[in-house]
Amino acid sequence: LLMLSFALLAANLTQAQDFDRREYRAVWLTTFLGLDWPKGHDPLTQQKQLCRILDQLQAAKVNTVLFQVRLRGTTAYASDIEPWDGIFTGTPGRRPTYDPLAFAIEECHRRGMELHAWMVAFPVCKLNVLKALGTKSVVRKHPELCRRSDDQYIMDPGMPGTADYLANLCRELVSKYDVDGIHLDYIRYPEAGLHFDDAATYRKYGKGRDLKTWRRDNVTRVVEKIHEAVKSQKPWVRLSCAPVGKYADLPRQSSRGWNARDAVGQDAVMWLNKGWMDVLFPMMYFDGDNYYPFVLDWLERAERGTVAPGLGVYCLSAGEKNWPLLTLQRQMNFLRTAEAGGFALFRSDFLTNNTKGVYDWLAGEYTTRPVLTPPIENPQSTLPATPRATLTRQGYDLHFNFPTGGIHNIYIREGKTFSFLGQTATGHFTYRPALPARLYAEYAVRAMDRYGCESQPAFLKIGGEIPSLKDTLHVADLPIDVKAFWICDAFGRKLRTVDATSTIDVSDLRPGCYELRTVGRKGGSHRVRLFRR
């Protein structure tokens, strides 16, 4: 066992790009009708198959699982408000012998992935499911909040009680489970093709507003109530939604009657800019002029928060739109060029089944390294303290140990960038480099809070503790073949050249980590020492 002492130095970052850019790499995992959920009702089989799905997502460097927990007025978790969905046991309302959401949270966190609880907001259930659920259904408990729409029931956003009901549902979930986010789906009015009669509600509550404005205000009221409920319990839980893929008509491109703001009452841009949403995943299952200009429109309208467009992996299927893989590749490459906040893929089964080679391309070329999700606003506005740690080398393994609790991120220097290696919340992280030479690379560690906000980095190098200096650096046994010294920063960039003397003035250096290197008469250079100011 070889003990290596490291100096952990706080240093001001000179450029944000010195560390990997963060982005959402999300996947929708649909439990409704078992679309992405394991087949059969045996609990152990479900758990094993779910773990295999999560293993595949982890291997593709996915960092966020949008796990469907409220399906259609039924749940994938233990709720005192709504009944269990039948996909887990075969019988609607019957409790399974384990908690699927609790299990999924534990397994996602074990793999370093976030789990956002995906909740379908207004649609509740089909008529056949209503019959099976009986008095357990929200349709029977709160008939005043529900409207029949063809062969299903939909909650009426115009009824004031709808906002309170959904807010209470989200409050219960957040208080019981360690979810990383709440993700709202169908947080909108039905499309025009569905019959939805809210005329009586409009007459009672419209108060002189036109129908479109009134409907938009109703959905916004629900969003605001849910935001208050979630953030009052756990302000670090991320709130997101999946709006219709086009926000509004563009000056030179029509949405063809299908947009979020004007067609279905989703003013998602306002929700994001007011801070009621942390993330938007607009469902952009289009191509060409129906995709590219609308991506830019979302990004240009966002004044805060993150926009990570949702892309249709299912569109590759021959049974759907039968897109060539190149179409999706171009769309995803465009998101990087446009500096979007990441992406979300719909849906898991089409990805893990490698439809038209999409999984191989994603894991092998597009998401080759892990990254963190973007941070959200911390109302306290205080960053974590720069961490201190010890590190042990055992064979080809490096063991990072943090004496204080909390979340810590580990990075390795590659050129001028520090790339994300991994994260620990246990106080210990083990790294085995692919090449033994990387044992001697430069590392950085950063503490992180639940909001995703990181501390200033501490830089780690093998070679003994780095001394802290005030104004003067002393060099003992000055080499005779040295004509000068370089003073370099923590990234190896040369800051200045100084005379080869035994006493060097460093009083004007900013606090941080530095390296002193020789400049040989024959052109060579070697490290003399590390020091900090």
Which residues does each predicted region cover?
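C-terminal tail/sorting-segment detector
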Residues: 462-467, 474-476, 511-533
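Beta-strand-rich modules
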Residues: 431-453
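Active-site-adjacent "subsite" loops/lids of carbohydrate-active enzymes
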Residues: 22, 30, 34-47, 117, ...
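Pro/Thr/Ser/Gly-rich low-complexity, intrinsically disordered linker/stalk tracts
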Residues: 361-404, 451-463
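Substrate-binding cleft of secreted/luminal carbohydrate-active enzymes
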Residues: 268-291, 305-378
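Short, surface-exposed loop/turn motifs with a glycine/proline- and acidic-biased composition
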Residues: 436-442, 491-496, 500-522, 527
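Polysaccharide-binding and catalytic clefts of secreted carbohydrate-active enzymes
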Residues: 62-63, 111, 140-270, 274-276
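Catalytic domains of carbohydrate-active enzymes, especially glycoside hydrolases
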Residues: 48-74, 176-179
